Regions:
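An acidic-aromatic substrate-binding cleft motif
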Residues: 71-154
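N-terminal accessory beta-strand-rich subdomains and adjacent acidic, glycine-rich linkers
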Residues: 1-103
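Short acidic, gly/pro-rich beta-turn/loop elements at beta-sheet edges
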Residues: 28, 90, 127, 200-202
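Generic structural hydrophobic/aromatic packing signal, biased to beta-strands
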Residues: 7-9, 18-20, 78-82, 117-119, ...
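Aromatic- and carboxylate-enriched substrate-binding clefts and catalytic-loop regions
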Residues: 158-253
Length: 253
């Protein structure tokens, strides 16, 4: 069995959480069950990939015999063993943040934490209205109204708001400019689902477009990897999003 981090173990009367921090230009760490114990493993560097339909998936078809190509004069990721008497104590553990490279920016006041709704299931189950539920302006305004009424910070437009291959090809039933105006008036932030490998084709261009239609965040899905190339893509997306003050939910890693 293969396990990604964070991983939590109970050893007698203690809880041990294994984490990592400062993973830059390097693959993530996995745990492999080996009998009664676990051993660590890194995904090897991808040499060749094969794209699925419209970049909806990207499969590694050939890997190297090594895990990374990087410089020797650098720091490598921290491995953390967080130990607690009770599970709840791990929630406030700050080691991941304390061991990470300090942030390049000093103002993150624009990042507003908050609860979100999304339309993935809900848009299929809206009844008793004068419109048909689905991926359309009326349904999304309905969600925005719900958020505004109950003080929920974000509304996530999930898969279907655009073409999966080209994020600029917006669903013809959706007026993003009108929705953005409507959401802004009600102080609800719009978060857009994007496929990682569609976004990869033009990270800065697509983020410029999303910013222009009022995006406050993106939900990035279907990386399905954390080898060196994937980790570098995480950082590229995060860096470009930071420039535009767009928050990120890295969803499918």
């Amino acid at each position: 069995a293969l396990f990604s981090l964070p991983a939590l173990f109970q050893v007698k009367n203690k809880f041990i959480e294994i984490l990592e921090s400062d993973v830059v230009d390097f693959p993530g760490l996995w745990l492999v069950k080996n009998g009664q114990s676990f051993q660590s493993e890194h995904p090897q560097k991808a040499l060749e990939t094969k794209a699925g339909p419209c970049y909806y998936e990207q499969y590694v078809t050939k890997r190297a015999s090594y895990i990374a190509e990087t410089t020797g004069n650098r720091n490598y990721p921290w491995r953390i063993f967080a130990i607690a008497d009770q599970e709840k104590e791990l929630i406030t553990n700050q080691l991941v943040y304390l061991l990470a490279t300090p942030a390049v920016e000093d103002d993150y006041s624009w990042i507003q934490p908050g609860l979100a709704t999304l339309d993935w299931w809900g848009r299929r189950n809206i009844y008793g209205t004068d419109f048909t539920g689905g991926v359309n302006t009326e349904t999304h305004k309905y969600f925005v109204d719900f958020n505004s009424r109950y003080g929920l910070k974000y509304f996530v437009l999930d898969d279907g708001w655009s073409d999966a291959c080209d994020l600029k090809k917006v669903n013809e039933n959706l007026d993003l400019n009108e929705l953005s105006r409507y959401a802004q008036e009600r102080q609800v932030g719009l978060v857009f689902w994007v496929h990682a490998y569609a976004l990869k084709q033009d990270v800065s261009g697509y983020l410029d477009f999303l910013q222009s239609v009022g995006a406050k965040g993106i939900k990035v899905d279907f990386f399905n990897r954390d080898d060196q190339d994937a980790v570098n893509l995480f950082h590229q997306i995060a860096s470009e999003a930071l420039k535009r003050k767009i928050v990120i939910d890295f969803h499918g890693i």
